[in-house]
């Protein structure tokens, strides 16, 4: 999937609610790719379903390699590291960060507690995937 770099200055976004456009979503994805080097990014929630309002948040599942430095952190700390990439963003951003191994375990050993992740993987929109 070819990517086009969009210049977007996250340091200059005001704190009031900002409309989330496709350009903003692309810029968020590109920044995560540049700074985190994920294996995959999946958009989910109202934006993936097409039911979002112009001020709806961005929901992302970010899958990282188990050797990625973020993999050493707990889930909420991984989330915090992603949010630090977007100071003064002016829009809601919810991110679930899992390792490839955690995703594999969810798929193969799910006992109901990970149904949301399975739904995201099945119904979400892939925004980025590393080339093999």
Positions of predicted regions on the chain:
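Catalytic core of pol beta-like nucleotidyltransferases
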Residues: 1-40, 49-54, 64-132
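Glycine-rich beta-strand-to-loop/alpha-helix junction loops that act as flexible
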Residues: 44-46
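Short beta-strand->loop micro-motif that forms the acidic, two-metal-ion catalytic signature
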Residues: 59-63
């Amino acid at each position: 999937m070819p990517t086009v770099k969009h210049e977007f200055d996250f340091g200059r976004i005001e704190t009031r609610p900002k409309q989330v456009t496709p350009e903003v979503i692309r810029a968020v994805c590109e920044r995560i790719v540049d700074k985190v080097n994920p294996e995959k990014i999946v958009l989910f929630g109202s934006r993936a379903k097409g039911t979002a309002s112009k001020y709806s948040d961005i929901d992302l599942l970010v899958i990282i390699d188990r050797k990625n430095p973020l993999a050493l952190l707990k889930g909420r700390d991984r989330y915090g590291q992603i949010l630090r990439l977007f100071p003064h963003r002016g829009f809601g951003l919810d991110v679930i960060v899992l390792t490839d191994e955690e995703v594999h375990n969810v798929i193969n050993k799910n006992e109901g507690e990970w149904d949301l992740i399975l739904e995201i993987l099945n119904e979400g929109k892939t925004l980025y995937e590393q080339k093999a």
